Amino acid sequence: MAWWLQNNLRMIQNNLRDIDAGMDVDAWFAEIESSHCNCVMVGAGGITSFYPTNLPYQTRSPYLKGDLLGEIVRVCHAHGVRVIARFDFSKTHERLLAEHPEWYYVSEAGEHLHYNDTAATCVCGEYQQRLSIEILREVLENYPVDGIFFNMFGFQTKDYSNVEHGICNCPACRKAYLDYCGRDLPQGQDWKTDETYAAFKEQVVGDLLLRIRRAVKAINPEVAICTYHHKGVDIIREESNSAVDRPLPFFLYSASENCQSAAGSWGGEKTMLNCAINAVDIFYRFQGVSPELTKIRLYENMAAGSQLDFCIIGDFADYPDRAGVAAMREVFGVHARNEALYGKFQSLARVLLYRPRKGDPEYLGWFNLLKDGHVLFDVLDHPAAVEHPERAAGYAALIVPDPARAPAAMLRAAREGGAKLLFSGLVDGEATEALRLLGVEWRTTLRNTRAAYLSTADKTRFPSFPERDWVILDREFGVFSGAQGALPLVHSAMFGPPERCFGHETGEERGLLRSADGTSAAFAFRLGRLYHDYGYADHRLLALDALRDLAPEAFLLRTNAPTCVEVFWNGLPDGRMFLQLLNLSGFNGVTVEPCIPVPNVEICLPCAVTGVHPLEGAPQPAVEAGGAQTRLRFAPLARYQAFVLDV
């Protein structure tokens, strides 16, 4: 087995600055060793070389006196710590621009992208297409690093101040796009939504990563390749980060979402490193986020079956935020003491959630509501659904946000495997396969439903609404004919002044469609987006009632836990089971403070549990066995508690 498939890393990335080229490696490693760390990521080449490069298109750090990369590899390997070398080919020192302007990004206005003393390169240019591989070759032939990582890989159009500079118009891009589709590059704002250009970018990035893979593996097949992409890599990297200008709502499940999307899509083939970025933002690299947020992100990493990854800027010696480092060490210690249990989980989930694209709010809303509703589920990312549609088989239910993008082969595999299909955001006629499966025809789309409602008067289908008959609707609503349905549309009426607030009429339109054979259902509005944006429990309850009505076997465990308790339940290779409870209290929507112990939590599991073994001295839960079910009653929950279950 390749070393990265062991899925047990506790990695620290010191994002090296030029001035760190002269750091005290022994003092640095003492910090690494005290952090239970078994892998480091350090700067090697690209923008700055942290070793004595002989290549004219690299720039050595002016503070480099010896060979920092060589020293780090020597010290780390002497103590059994792996080293992943970091490269950033997105920029070079600007001195090279005058000699080779063809390597660099060019805006629509014909301008290069400068930032401080660097200039942005283009992924289509010779520097990234050919010379980057020569830089990798120089490192791999001279240093026994365990892996390589590429930062800011692909088509980069924003600078560090988050300013958008637009599509690259360099000669290499223009030629490559013309060869790809016979057209000129899209201009203005059109490039952001142009599907042909998006496919072109994916092909360019994927082809380059595959060429890099062939070159790297020819030198040393044991070197792991890692970046923010799935193509040609051994380790997919993502980040749980923060940004001061990022719109609310704050997505607390970031680490779980990143890890679950990789595990469900590429498990057994690739592993994931989801980096808990300590910095508040790129602008504020020297203050960390709340230490409690760092703990949540790292605990979610390991609870979701992934590895640990933490990043700070520069060396520990002059890093001014020791609180975040202490939080990291707490979680790394838990993982290190129980390493044999982590990274080898076997999913018990009966629900599969399709991810149409990263960051899609309809999808994120469904991720949120399933987590909040304590439904166990896996995630299948769109590229994996295209390459491996068979991975959708074997579930009780497949949930499909953005039905128009869903691959037909994935839907077919899910149905043939016995899954019921639940579509969400079916608001127009573009999702032809979903319409066929539902047996409906699209009539029209209501673009503005502000002040409209959905009726939950049918309490047999919507038992979660004993005292509430209307639930708010907003944004688009699809009108269809030919299907059975529920959730009648209550049309908008007057909403002001109070004396005129009447006149609502219930129409024939339905918010929940269902096929005649009972194998498919669809929300004719963006339910996930409403939950993502507004957070009303009503939309979560609509979703869970509909899912329970469609596929009751999708619900494995029962619990009275509040939404602030994230539940993970998996199988272990030896036949035992692993239950993890993450207390997310202390989060008020923006601020993350220490958690409040959550009392009186009970979980009912659909199996006979014969023994419970708490980790890290957690209190023993009360066990009530009853045939094929077991009820566990827990002492007040701390931030993270885990239990090995004999079954």
Question: Which positions does each model-derived feature cover?
Answer:
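N-terminal small/glycine-rich loop or linker at the start of catalytic domains
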Residues: 1-15, 106-120, 267-282
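Short, acidic/polar
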Residues: 18-34, 128-139, 290-298, 385
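Carbohydrate-binding surfaces of carbohydrate-active enzymes
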Residues: 6-8, 83, 190, 194-647
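Aromatic-lined carbohydrate-binding/catalytic grooves of carbohydrate-active enzymes
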Residues: 28-68, 91-110, 114-116, 157-169, ...
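Active-site-adjacent "subsite" loops/lids of carbohydrate-active enzymes
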Residues: 85, 89-143, 173-202, 207-211
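Conserved, mostly hydrophobic/aromatic
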Residues: 11, 32, 76, 132, ...
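Mature N-terminal, pre-catalytic/accessory segment of carbohydrate-active enzymes
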Residues: 1-50, 54-86, 222, 344-348, ...
